[in-house]
A protein has these predicted regions:
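Transmembrane helix boundary and interhelical loop/hinge segments in multi-pass membrane proteins
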Residues: 80-99
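A structural motif at transmembrane helix-loop-helix junctions in multipass membrane proteins
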Residues: 156-189
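Terminal transmembrane helical anchor/hairpin motif
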Residues: 1, 13, 17, 21, ...
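Secretory targeting signals
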Residues: 114-167
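A short amphipathic helical element positioned immediately N-terminal to and/or at the very start
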Residues: 2-12, 97
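Long, hydrophobic alpha-helical segments
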Residues: 62-86
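Membrane-interface alpha-helices at helix entry/exit sites of multi-pass transporters
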Residues: 104-117, 223
Length: 226
């Protein structure tokens, strides 16, 4: 398994490095403009939208929670993209060469899924640390760094569920793995846009992103993450 993980990592590390840099920059922007969010949303309708996305808390916390929630979906998109490298390798017949060496299909698939999941952790850390650092510099409160880091990391269980959908669909067939994109779009519509459309709660809760604690600004609870 270790050798196949190494192969999956070598194939993915270039793309992941670019994603990490992009997310670090995004985090700096998100955290850097947090203090000025009130001036950007000086209409009552604009502030209401952010509060509904981020929960009933202060405007800045609502903005940060909403941005991290959106970035959580983008992290999931990376996870789907990385996991679908399985399909690329199989279509190019490079997978056959690896499997011919005695590596089991479970080992091969598991290695790519593991690397995809690890990549999402890297992205969450990048955006959490950079946004938290930018916000902490603004406020002078080190706690803001940890709050935003937590807000990024709590997105991961929902992200991993999306990757699990890809893995399960791939077990049916390589083309079926594309179901992962459909699942992600459905979860996005339900979890992020559902509250704005005032859909029934039970429909919204079909999305794993609807169960993610809205940090910063609320108390972290473990139950929704399990």
């Amino acid at each position: 398994l270790s050798s196949t993980v190494g192969l999956a990592w070598r194939l993915e590390r270039g793309a992941l490095s670019a994603w990490v840099i992009a997310f670090a920059i995004l985090g700096l922007v998100v955290g850097g403009v947090a203090g000025d969010v009130g001036s950007f949303l000086n209409t009552s309708s604009g502030q209401d939208v952010l509060r509904r996305l981020g929960g009933e808390k202060s405007l800045v916390d609502a903005y940060l929670a909403a941005e991290l929630g959106i970035l959580g979906v983008v992290i999931a998109a990376y996870g789907v993209h990385a996991a679908l490298r399985l399909r690329t390798e199989e279509d190019s017949r490079r997978a056959e060469e690896v499997l011919a060496t005695g590596v089991t299909r479970v080992q091969w698939v598991g290695s790519f899924i593991l690397v995809a999941a690890a990549g999402t952790v890297c992205l969450a850390l990048a955006v959490g640390l950079s946004s938290g650092a930018a916000r902490a510099v603004q406020t002078g409160q080190v706690s803001d760094l940890f709050d935003l880091l937590a807000g990024a990391l709590v997105q991961l269980p929902a992200v991993w569920l999306v990757i699990a959908v890809v893995a399960a669909a791939y077990g049916i067939g390589s083309r079926a793995a594309l179901i992962g994109w459909g699942a992600l779009v459905a979860f996005l519509l339900l979890g992020e846009i559902g509250p704005l459309l005032e859909l029934p709660e039970w429909i919204i809760e079909l999305s794993p992103f609807a169960h993610v604690p809205e940090l910063p600004g609320t108390t972290l609870t473990v139950a929704p993450l399990v």
